[in-house]
């Protein structure tokens, strides 16, 4: 017969943030001694930190506020939609929006309710029971456009794009948000072809030439074939050279030009994807 009550379990859960079974086991091992149960859970939490550090974080969310985009990762989609996890992400992005830290390490060192952001994350990790990782942050001065995409209706956004642009008015803001949606969908890497590193372009030309030769294309046709395939590569990775996902008859550049918008830079975060 258990030497503790349901009220003891409830109180222990509220005090420690641990799960129901963990609290029941702790009370059973402590033979109903509440203080000992608390101590056991604290010790177990400290030990679990090392175990959690070795686990992978393939789930999570992206969140944005006032020119900041950040990604907070966890292990399971169950935690990704957990209220405590969502509140943690919101509190962190609020701090980031106010301070505009340069990188993740700078954000982790900022104050959040009297503790560092990193400490709060570790405490929530112990409470939730999963490894939590603040993996990415970007901060733009603006004006900015944001697009957040959900993979599933019951989960928080897993893809986020932050675009910094020049332009004025509602039409400019709408066009910039359209560009953010474009990046989310087609994963552009550069704003214009001038941003593509020369060594990458040279490598694409080499691949195009070798492929054309392997296909037995006539020598006199090679220059045109190579140019066409390199241009195809640009359409894959350069935002302004892509066909718009909103209007396939127009390029992204044409839509931006009509609205008087110039994209200065953008970032795209996707939960589970490498940096």
From Swiss-Prot:
It is found in: Cytoplasm. Belongs to the EF-Ts family. Pfam families: EF_TS. Its main location: cytoplasm. GO terms for molecular function: translation elongation factor activity. The lineage of its organism: Bacteria, Bacillati, Actinomycetota, Actinomycetes, Mycobacteriales. HAMAP family: EF_Ts (MF_00050). Keywords: Cytoplasm, Elongation factor, Protein biosynthesis. This is Elongation factor Ts. Associates with the EF-Tu.GDP complex and induces the exchange of GDP to GTP. It remains bound to the aminoacyl-tRNA.EF-Tu.GTP complex up to the GTP hydrolysis stage on the ribosome. Residues 76-79 are annotated as: Involved in Mg(2+) ion dislocation from EF-Tu. InterPro entries: EF-Ts_dimer_sf, Transl_elong_EFTs/EF1B, Transl_elong_EFTs/EF1B_dimer, Transl_elong_Ts_CS, UBA-like_sf. Gene3D superfamilies: 1.10.286.20, DNA helicase RuvA subunit, C-terminal domain (1.10.8.10), Elongation factor Ts, dimerisation domain (3.30.479.20). NCBIfam families: tsf. The keyword Endoplasmic reticulum does not apply. One of its GO terms (cellular component) is cytoplasm.
């Amino acid at each position: 017969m258990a030497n503790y009550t349901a009220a003891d379990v409830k109180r222990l859960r509220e005090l420690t943030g641990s799960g129901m079974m963990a609290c029941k086991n702790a009370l059973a091992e402590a033979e109903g001694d509440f203080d000992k149960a608390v101590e056991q859970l604290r010790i177990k939490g400290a030990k679990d930190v090392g175990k959690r550090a070795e686990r992978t974080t393939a789930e999570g969310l992206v969140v944005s506020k006032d020119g900041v985009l950040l990604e907070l990762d966890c292990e399971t989609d169950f935690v990704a939609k957990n209220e405590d996890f969502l509140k943690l992400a919101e509190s962190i992005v609020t701090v980031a929006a106010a301070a505009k830290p340069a990188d993740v390490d700078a954000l982790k060192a900022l104050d959040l309710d009297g503790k560092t952001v990193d400490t709060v994350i570790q405490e929530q990790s112990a409470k939730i029971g999963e490894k939590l990782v603040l993996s990415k942050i970007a901060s733009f001065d603006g004006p900015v456009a944001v697009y957040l995409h959900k993979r599933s209706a019951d989960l928080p956004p897993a893809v986020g794009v932050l675009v910094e642009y020049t332009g004025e008015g509602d039409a400019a803001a709408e066009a910039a948000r359209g560009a953010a949606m474009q990046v989310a969908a087609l994963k552009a890497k550069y704003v214009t072809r001038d941003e593509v590193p020369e060594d990458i372009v040279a490598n694409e030309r080499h691949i195009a030439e070798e492929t054309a030769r392997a296909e037995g294309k006539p020598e006199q046709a090679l220059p045109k074939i190579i140019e066409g395939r390199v241009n195809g590569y640009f359409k894959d990775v350069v935002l302004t050279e892509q066909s718009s996902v909103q209007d396939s008859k127009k390029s992204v550049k044409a839509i931006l030009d009509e609205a008087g918008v110039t994209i200065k830079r953008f970032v795209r975060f996707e939960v589970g994807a490498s940096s």
